[in-house]
Each structure stands twice: as C-alpha cells, then as structure tokens.
Amino acid sequence: MFVNKKYTAKGKNLPSSPKKVRPIADNIRGKPYNEAVAILCSMPNKGAKLLGKVVKSAASNAMYHNRNLSEDMIFVKTVMVDDGRKRRSIWPRARGRADRLINRSCHIFVEVYEKMYGGE
C-alpha cells in the first residue's frame, strides 16, 4: 500500500517581492527534498535563501512528527508564493513633487509529503 502524509510550513511577510520568488519556487516544485535544497543552495538570489528556510522548516516538521522518517523519503509537493503586506512611503523628488515607493513582501506556503510503502 502506498502511504502519503502531508506536512506544512509557512513564512509570512518575508522581505522579497513575490514576482522575484515565484520563478525560484517553480524550480523546486515536485522534487525530492535533498534535490530541492541543493538547487536552492546553489542559487545566489535572496528569494532562494528565504524559500530554503521555509522548505527546511517543513521537512523539520515532518521529521518531528514522524521519528522514523528520513530526508530521502520527503518530497516537495506544493509551493505557493502570495502577496504579503505592502509598505508605502514617499520619495521626495525635484520641484516639490513626490513619488510613492512600495516595498513588497510575500507569504510562502510549502507542503511536503512522505513517500513510503507501508503494510495494509
């Protein structure tokens, strides 16, 4: 019998634009945990570092709840990157004008599952 259990982790209001993190998330979706972490560690992006922390947290949650689980049995199932809070501020310009500055953040949701063969 094929057994699947899901474990999740969330990162809220992480200081990076969702537009920059989503392409990185597409690279690791559906991959084994060890391969996903290797991909994220080799990327120079700030978003890869943030995403790596959330993926490691989800794997830690899985290994905490199931002591017999090893890293080889964990696969990344779902990675969602959503908009977080936007911090708006004013940027003074020439001739008394002002531009609006928007600092974006993102929420990252990662779901990993264990893949193992169990009894009936």
Swiss-Prot record:
GO terms for molecular function: rRNA binding; structural constituent of ribosome. Belongs to the universal ribosomal protein uL22 family. Gene3D superfamilies: Ribosomal protein L22/L17 (3.90.470.10). Part of the 50S ribosomal subunit. The gene is rplV. This is Large ribosomal subunit protein uL22. Keywords: Ribonucleoprotein, Ribosomal protein, RNA-binding, rRNA-binding. InterPro entries: Ribosomal_uL22, Ribosomal_uL22_bac/chlpt-type, Ribosomal_uL22_bac/org-type, Ribosomal_uL22_CS, Ribosomal_uL22_sf.
